[in-house]
């Protein structure tokens, strides 16, 4: 039986994940928070909803900005990693692997997903500004 090559997703374990995004004055803060929580498995959302840190700041032109940040460590971080791997489409997983050299630094994997799609409970890699930033700290096996 032919052995399948290992990929980033199958050969790595996440020990920590940091999710962050911002809500501008024109955005509904509740929807932005929902989008952030939609990134994690449904079974963990209630547990971590109260752990989201909120920071209010001002933009360059004095516009109010709310920054949301959630840090998860341990086994739940790996559960989130696997959930995201399964939730991304095959094309997005391949794109991440093909751009790995610009996404991986010192065992940290950087991914940006569309905030709009996350609100709709779909994950899509997005390189624009309206994103949820995801930073995984990985412990990796060997990738073929």
Model-derived segments and spans:
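Long, hydrophobic N-terminal alpha-helical segment
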Residues: 1-47
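Beta-strand elements of well-folded, non-transmembrane domains
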Residues: 21-25, 40, 72-76, 115-117, ...
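Short cationic amphipathic helices and targeting signals
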Residues: 17-23, 67-72, 107-111, 132-137
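Short, conserved charged micro-motifs
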Residues: 27-31, 76-83, 120, 144
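A common structural junction motif
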Residues: 39-44, 88-92, 128-131
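Glycine-rich, aromatic-bearing surface loops/beta-hairpins
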Residues: 105-144
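Short, charge-patterned binding micro-sites
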Residues: 46-75
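Mid-chain, well-packed structural core segment of small domains
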Residues: 78-109
């Amino acid at each position: 039986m032919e052995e399948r090559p290992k990929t980033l997703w199958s050969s790595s374990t996440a020990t920590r994940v940091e999710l962050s995004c911002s809500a501008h004055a024109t955005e509904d803060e509740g929807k932005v928070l929902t989008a952030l929580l939609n990134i994690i498995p449904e079974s963990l959302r209630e547990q971590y909803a109260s752990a989201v840190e909120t920071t209010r700041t001002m933009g360059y032109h004095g516009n109010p900005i709310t920054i949301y940040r959630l840090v998860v460590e341990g086994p739940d971080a790996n559960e989130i990693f696997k959930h995201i791997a399964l939730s991304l489409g095959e094309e997005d997983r391949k794109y991440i692997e093909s751009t790995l050299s610009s996404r991986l630094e010192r065992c940290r994997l950087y991914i940006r997903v569309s905030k709009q799609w996350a609100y709709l409970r779909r994950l899509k890699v997005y390189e624009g500004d309206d994103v949820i930033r995801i930073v995984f700290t990985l412990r990796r096996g060997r990738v073929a």
